[in-house]
Amino acid sequence: MAGRKKAADFEQQLARLQEIVDALEGGDLPLEKSVALYKEGLGLARASREQLAKARNEIRLFTEGEVRDFDPEEGDDGDDR
């Protein structure tokens, strides 16, 4: 359950970050609002990078310390056990 919450939080952060990017790219905001959104976006980007780094480290642990490129076809035999 905790993993689903983290995933939802991550997805919400990305969605909010996209909203901020869209608003800033629109160019219709006052300067103060643009700066505030930019700062919020930086915080969201930093938090998202940290979450991705943590997930990457967890995956490395699952592969017994062996670091290799992700191959979506590798090991997918359709058995989800």
From Swiss-Prot:
Keywords recorded for this protein, A-Z: Cytoplasm, Exonuclease, Hydrolase, Nuclease
InterPro entries attached here? Exonuc_VII_S, Exonuc_VII_ssu_sf
Annotated GO CC locations: cytosol; exodeoxyribonuclease VII complex
The catalysed reaction is: Exonucleolytic cleavage in either 5'- to 3'- or 3'- to 5'-direction to yield nucleoside 5'-phosphates
Write down the EC number.
3.1.11.6
Q: Which GO terms describe its molecular function?
A: exodeoxyribonuclease VII activity
Q: Where in the cell is it found?
A: Cytoplasm
What is the top EC class of this enzyme, as a single word?
Answer: hydrolase
Q: Name one GO biological process term.
A: DNA catabolic process
Question: Subunit details for this protein?
Answer: Heterooligomer composed of large and small subunits.
Q: Which PANTHER family match?
A: EXODEOXYRIBONUCLEASE 7 SMALL SUBUNIT
Q: What does this protein do?
A: Bidirectionally degrades single-stranded DNA into large acid-insoluble oligonucleotides, which are then degraded further into small acid-soluble oligonucleotides.
- Please state which protein family the record places this protein in: Belongs to the XseB family.
Q: Which HAMAP family match?
A: Exonuc_7_S (MF_00337)
Listed name of the protein? Exodeoxyribonuclease 7 small subunit
Source organism per UniProt: Nitratidesulfovibrio vulgaris (strain ATCC 29579 / DSM 644 / CCUG 34227 / NCIMB 8303 / VKM B-1760 / Hildenborough)
The encoding gene is xseB
